[in-house]
Amino acid sequence: MILQAWRSLQLLYLLEAISLLPCTEALLCYEATASAFRAVSLHNWKWLLLRSMVCNQREGCEETVVFIETGTSKGVLSFKGCSSAFSYPPQISYLVSPPGVSIASYSRVCRSYLCNNLTNLEPFVRLKASQPMSTLPSAKSCPSCVGKHDQECLPSFVTTENCPFAASSCYSSTLKFQAGNLNTTFLIMGCARDSHKLLADFQHIGSIRVTEVINVLDKSEAVSAGHCSQGISWSVLLCLLILLRD
């Protein structure tokens, strides 16, 4: 009888302990995507957070922002939503550092109520302020733009950029960013250290899947080699890019 009573008491203690354990509730996170290439400024860009979503159990809230600069043009692509990744503090760095085309990213995963609440580009302001400026010029110039093939990067909107000495190769690629409702294909052109893939080591930025197709211009030259000279103009190549867009 004593043993049975003791076991019953142990069971009661166990049930009480279980009842005191915190419940694993689904987390509420902001849900948003952004893809902007016009009038983007480090100081006046604002992200309106209007939607939220309920995540699956054990998922956290993610926010990933990519900031791109080439010449005087800027672009922002970003994703907010649920993530199964482990939590990690804010991480900000240059994936491709200046001079020339630069690509920086900010990303974090958190696990508290609506914690993915970044609404501005302040982290990139601080990152850019810490980067030394390069002013030594070269004799090279390249077309420069970032944006949609049929919008911001139409030939009439493409500018010519004088390249710094440390980034005197002309770069051009079509990038595709995909995450949740974010599905954006865009063109980036400008001065770079070389003309190879800039994001070869970054198939994912946070949850954003990155696809980079490089040397579209070279492909155009190869196709038209029988009809055009190798000195084909950038404006003609840009027109070909428009025809090749998705």
From Swiss-Prot:
Name the UniProt key words of this record, in alphabetical order. Answer: Cell membrane, Glycoprotein, GPI-anchor, Lipoprotein, Membrane, Repeat, Signal
UPAR/Ly6 domain location: 142-223
User: Does the keyword RNA-binding feature in the UniProt annotation?
Assistant: no
Covalent lipid attachment of type GPI-anchor amidated alanine occurs at: A225
Task: One Pfam family, please name it.
Answer: UPAR_LY6
Q: Propeptide-annotated positions?
A: 226-246
Q: Which residues form the signal peptide?
A: 1-26
Q: How does it sit in the membrane?
A: Lipid-anchor; GPI-anchor
Could you tell me the superkingdom of the organism this chain comes from? Eukaryota
- Keyword DNA damage in the entry? The reply is no
- Localization in the cell: Cell membrane
Q: Which GO terms are recorded in the biological process aspect for this UniProt protein?
A: binding of sperm to zona pellucida; single fertilization; sperm migration through the uterotubal junction
A GO CC term attached to the entry = plasma membrane
Show the PANTHER family listed in the entry: CD177 ANTIGEN, LY6_PLAUR DOMAIN CONTAINING 10-RELATED
Q: What is this protein called?
A: Ly6/PLAUR domain-containing protein 4
Organismal lineage: Eukaryota, Metazoa, Chordata, Craniata, Vertebrata
Its encoding gene is what?
Lypd4
